[in-house]
């Protein structure tokens, strides 16, 4: 990044207009593939591949071809004869698209660093902690228990590839880079395969994750920009958390066009959505907006979002993709947890002089539970148990060593306990732990052609120790016997700031 900054340093006023020449720099592809330039072994000797291998020699040959021939003229007559679109088009497109994604991130990274540098010394937030998935749940615990209604929103998909190009045009003003992006999108992938989870686009996103996530996040940021705008316009105290979000050109013109749908007076429209208790969270292609306001206010927000996305993105957005739910009467599947706001009744006895009376008090509490049925379904899909939750052996792992089998089962159990540590009721987790432990024992018994009882007698406590989580290991040393303190810790919620992704159960790398 320092070398890129030196490249863009001579003319800061036009630094966003010179991204295209970086495509022909070799170190860009090294950075995109997380290769260091000063390693002991030569990268040039690596074999080219489609998954995780990379070769500078292939990139140099590709760049030479791009200089010698004009491969970017799309023609229906000679597309079959074009060597660039031949047998190696998947490898070439993968390398260039990942390099392009790294280059296109430069304007965003420079602006983000300059914005975060202004917060140094103020201790407003730590960005590396906010990367964790668990960082969202303390925010929900602190705020959602005081709110009434929530909007469950499915983020709309762009109906045309040109929308993705136009979205980046506000940030990257390099016409050559945008033409290259347009070439990738129109030549190799169509809309349905790029954004949705159909097979062609799904394989593309698996191989070009950086490129895919960059395009999708740019589009989602464009969808969310209206919340930043309205929040800053309707609030006298600007929120410092929006300091890293920068507005784009022509946005005010689009807002004024949208205002014509609601009212002639823009200030009246802003007054309708002035809500200091509005909270917004996005996750997994969905988003939720919670408010302390009434059902009428949430209904206004719903139709505002529908009209905004229809006018701004020229797409047909159905109102059925936004649902209004009352927090106290609705449970939702949120990031693998089952979250809800419950009313916990409590009885308070009050004594005044000689008279005593009881006061019924209901307190709202944000409750987070572990969904047992989806977890058992995931374990059944990976052949750890039946659909009813009965443990079975896993014959695919019978060829592995005993230590590898125990380590794989133990890693899955520890990962599940680590992620679902925020649940206050861990009875479900101990049932999952029982399924995995017995499935491990049956797999080992199947390998050694013995019964489960015989194997457990021979292994003793070694198998049990492998399934202990980090919290249980500490508790077993601190509290050698069961006590009230031990069970109190078991019931407590623990949120970790080192969980950045949710891996599949079958991913053991």
Curated annotation (Swiss-Prot):
One of the GO BP terms on file: mRNA processing
Protein name: Maturase K
Record GO terms (molecular function): RNA binding
Annotated organism of origin: Anthocercis angustifolia (Narrow-leaf ray-flower)
Compartment(s): Plastid, Chloroplast
Bilayer-spanning residue ranges: none
Keywords of this entry: Chloroplast, mRNA processing, Plastid, RNA-binding, tRNA processing
Pfam families, alphabetized: Intron_maturas2, MatK_N
Entry function: Usually encoded in the trnK tRNA gene intron. Probably assists in splicing its own and other chloroplast group II introns.
InterPro entries the record matches: Domain_X, Maturase_MatK, Maturase_MatK_N
One Gene Ontology cellular component annotation held by this UniProt entry: chloroplast
């Amino acid at each position: 990044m320092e070398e890129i900054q030196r490249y863009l340093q001579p003319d800061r006023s036009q630094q966003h207009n010179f991204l295209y020449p970086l495509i022909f720099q070799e170190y860009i592809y090294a950075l995109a593939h997380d290769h260091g330039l000063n390693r002991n072994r030569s990268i040039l000797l690596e074999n080219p591949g489609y998954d995780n291998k990379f070769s500078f020699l292939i990139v140099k040959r590709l760049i030479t071809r791009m200089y010698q021939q004009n491969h970017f003229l799309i023609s229906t007559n000679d597309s079959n004869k074009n060597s660039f679109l031949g047998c190696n088009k998947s490898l070439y497109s993968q390398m260039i698209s990942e390099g392009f994604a790294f280059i296109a991130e430069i304007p965003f990274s420079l602006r983000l660093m300059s914005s975060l540098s202004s917060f140094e010394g103020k201790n407003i937030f730590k960005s590396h902690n906010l990367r964790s998935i668990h960082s969202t749940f303390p925010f929900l615990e602190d705020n959602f228990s005081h709110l009434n209604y929530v909007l469950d929103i499915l983020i709309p998909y762009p109906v045309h590839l040109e929308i993705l190009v136009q979205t980046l045009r506000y940030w990257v003003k390099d016409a050559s880079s945008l033409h290259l992006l347009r070439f990738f999108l129109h030549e190799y992938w169509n809309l349905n395969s790029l954004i949705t989870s159909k097979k062609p686009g799904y394989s593309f996103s698996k191989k070009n994750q950086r490129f895919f996530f960059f395009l999708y996040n740019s589009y989602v940021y464009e969808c969310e920009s209206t919340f930043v705008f309205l929040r800053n316009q309707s609030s006298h105290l600007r929120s410092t958390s929006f300091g890293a979000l920068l507005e784009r050109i022509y946005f005010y013109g689009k807002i004024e066009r949208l205002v014509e749908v609601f009212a002639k007076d823009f200030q009246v429209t802003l007054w309708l959505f002035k809500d200091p208790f509005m909270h917004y969270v996005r996750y997994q292609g969905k988003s939720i907006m919670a408010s302390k306001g009434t059902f009428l206010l949430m209904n206004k927000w719903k139709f505002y979002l529908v009209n905004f996305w229809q006018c701004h993105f020229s797409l047909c957005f159905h109102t059925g993709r936004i649902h209004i739910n009352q927090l106290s009467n609705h449970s939702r599947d949120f990031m693998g947890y089952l979250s809800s706001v419950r009313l916990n009744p409590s009885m308070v006895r009050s004594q005044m002089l000689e008279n005593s009376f009881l006061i019924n008090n209901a307190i709202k509490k944000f409750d987070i539970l572990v969904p047992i049925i989806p977890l058992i379904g995931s374990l059944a899909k990976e052949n750890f148990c039946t659909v009813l939750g009965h443990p079975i052996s896993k014959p695919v792992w019978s060829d592995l060593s005993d230590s590898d089998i125990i380590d794989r089962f133990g890693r899955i159990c520890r990962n599940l306990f680590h992620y679902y540590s925020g649940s206050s009721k861990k009875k479900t987790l101990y049932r999952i732990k029982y399924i995995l432990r017995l499935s491990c024992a049956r797999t080992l018994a199947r390998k050694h052609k013995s019964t489960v009882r015989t194997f457990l007698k021979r292994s003793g406590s070694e198998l049990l120790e492998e399934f202990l989580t980090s919290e249980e290991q500490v508790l077993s040393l601190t509290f050698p016997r069961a006590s009230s303190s031990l069970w109190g810790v078991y019931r407590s919620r623990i949120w970790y700031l080192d969980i950045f992704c949710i891996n599949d159960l079958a991913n053991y790398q």
